């Protein structure tokens, strides 16, 4: 009797709501409602998601407003290099970046030895530093200088033109997520 009760409780309070959120995310993805995809899967830890959920969430973050440092054309190039068979680490990277977990994204980029992805993560971190109102001016300046040095080194290595003044990259021919 206790086992049956436990199974019912598990299904009712965990499995059914989880399946509902996954179904809602899939439906939103088909409708190209990327914000709703993100909202449906926001409570899921990366380790709890299947490959399909990771794929749709990663592409939703790229398409959505979460990754704002890219132009529409850059996003199209990035998306053209990602497919369902891509390395799951790529999906995890974009999910972390979309969730503003830049340190985790940087770590994944380093693990995959992907300088392009590392550069994107650095740019996202730079944006976070600039938007941080709680950081002292001295600390903000120091962190920005350190990060800008890393960004410029990677941009040079990747032959990407980078303008510090407006934090834009011209990545049209250099976007790579192999």
Go through the PLM ranges and name each one.
Residues 10-23:
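Transmembrane-cytosolic junction motif
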Residues 21-178:
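C-terminal soluble domains/tails of integral membrane proteins
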Residues 2-12:
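Hydrophobic membrane-insertion alpha-helices, especially the h-region
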């Amino acid at each position: 009797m206790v086992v049956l009760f436990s199974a019912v409780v598990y299904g009712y309070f965990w499995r059914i709501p989880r399946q509902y959120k996954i179904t809602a995310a899939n439906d939103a993805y088909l409708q190209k409602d990327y914000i709703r995809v993100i909202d449906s899967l926001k409570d899921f830890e990366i380790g709890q998601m299947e490959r399909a959920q990771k794929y749709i969430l990663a592409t939703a973050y790229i398409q959505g407003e979460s990754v704002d440092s890219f132009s529409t054309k850059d996003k199209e190039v990035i998306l053209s290099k990602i497919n369902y068979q891509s390395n799951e680490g790529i999906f995890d990277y974009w999910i972390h970046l979309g969730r503003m977990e830049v340190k985790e994204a940087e770590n994944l980029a380093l693990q995959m030895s992907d300088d392009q992805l590392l550069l994107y993560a650095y740019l996202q971190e730079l944006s976070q530093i600039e938007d941080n109102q709680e950081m002292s001016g001295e600390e903000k300046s120091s962190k920005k200088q350190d990060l800008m040095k890393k960004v410029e080194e990677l941009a040079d290595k990747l032959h990407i033109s980078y303008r510090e003044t407006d934090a834009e990259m011209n990545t049209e021919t250099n976007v790579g997520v192999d």
